[in-house]
């Protein structure tokens, strides 16, 4: 199944080239035609494998798991962000997509708490919840949709209204030709004049509707962009209290809030989640994969200057640039099941060793 995404614009293979020689344009042509390259499913599976290695390090670090295992996980979030951008762009129902991620976010948050209460393994702290990051990303992408709807070219509704009025006048003029005979020309002029006057108020009304729509969509976009930040403010009074100052009631209220609140303050990858709306906004530009990779590289450079190993996220651009626009295998619910399952299994195993 193809997904219509603006992948790299490529030329066809050089037909005049010598036999057996693969030109760069021919390579990109084959990637785009799905004979080479990676599908959405392939990129997701690369992320899953790297994620498991990273979480092995997380759960078994106190048992001597080498620190370099953590490096494998640095591109993972970026790969999942990219897959989410593609998925949100092509889903049949964005609302259902968001609801599904939100439910998984809450379930994963509850599972983290239950595992730590029941297993009580001190070697790893469970804060894993990629679903929260992805759901926050969908809020931001919905904001981008609002801005795109507000600022895209609507077409000249006033002109179309004017044209409709003139055509209406012509039709009325045509009937006048049959009735009035020799006064047809005068009727035509009068009819057109009346239609123009009738069209002008409709034209102004269409313009006001368009302006109102744009204002509405712009406001919706701003509110959606601000929402994950505003929801973070709800948590601050609880987090300001020291561990010893929190009552049992406050602790449980905080646990409930952290389960249901899509606050960017709680995101596993914090502000890196902002990569999602950036990549989403770039999805339809020419050479979109290149520009999305540039955005990733900019963030990676920032982490490099900060001295953090997260700069290794730059390696995510390799599979992203090889994306061929194909969906690949379905397995719609695989990740929703595998992610919490592998966290639980690794956490329990680590507690038993």
Residue ranges of model-derived segments:
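Alpha-helical transmembrane segments and their immediate juxtamembrane cytosolic regions
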Residues: 1-353
């Amino acid at each position: 199944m193809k997904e219509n995404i603006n992948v790299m614009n490529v030329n066809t293979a050089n037909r005049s080239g010598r036999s057996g020689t693969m030109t760069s344009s021919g390579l990109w042509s084959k990637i785009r035609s799905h004979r080479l390259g990676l599908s959405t499913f392939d990129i997701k599976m690369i992320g899953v494998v790297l994620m498991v290695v990273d979480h092995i390090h997380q759960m078994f670090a106190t048992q001597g798991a080498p620190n370099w295992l953590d490096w494998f996980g640095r591109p993972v979030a970026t790969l999942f962000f990219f897959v989410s951008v593609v998925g949100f762009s092509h889903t049949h129902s964005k609302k259902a997509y968001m609801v599904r991620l939100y439910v998984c976010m809450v379930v994963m948050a509850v599972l983290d708490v239950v595992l730590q209460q029941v297993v009580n393994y001190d070697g790893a702290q469970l804060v894993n919840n990629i679903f929260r990051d992805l759901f926050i990303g969908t809020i931001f992408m919905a904001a981008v949709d609002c801005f795109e709807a507000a600022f895209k070219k609507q077409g000249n509704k006033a002109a179309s209204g004017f044209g409709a009025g003139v055509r209406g006048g012509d039709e009325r003029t045509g009937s006048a030709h049959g009735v009035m005979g020799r006064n047809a020309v005068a009727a035509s002029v009068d009819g057109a004049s009346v239609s123009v006057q009738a069209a002008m108020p409709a034209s102004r009304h269409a313009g006001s509707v368009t302006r109102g729509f744009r204002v509405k969509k712009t406001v919706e976009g701003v509110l959606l962009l601000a929402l994950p930040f505003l929801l973070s403010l709800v948590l601050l009074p609880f987090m300001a209290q020291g561990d010893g100052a929190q009552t049992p009631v406050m602790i449980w209220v905080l646990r409930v809030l952290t389960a249901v609140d899509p606050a960017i303050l709680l995101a596993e990858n914090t502000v890196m989640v902002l990569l999602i709306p950036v990549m989403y906004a770039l999805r339809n530009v020419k050479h979109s994969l290149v520009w999305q990779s540039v955005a990733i590289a900019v963030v990676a450079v920032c982490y490099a200057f900060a001295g953090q190993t997260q700069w290794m996220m730059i390696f995510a651009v390799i599979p992203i640039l090889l994306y061929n626009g194909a969906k690949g295998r379905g397995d719609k619910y695989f990740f929703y099941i595998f992610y919490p399952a592998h966290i639980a299994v690794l956490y329990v195993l680590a507690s038993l060793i």
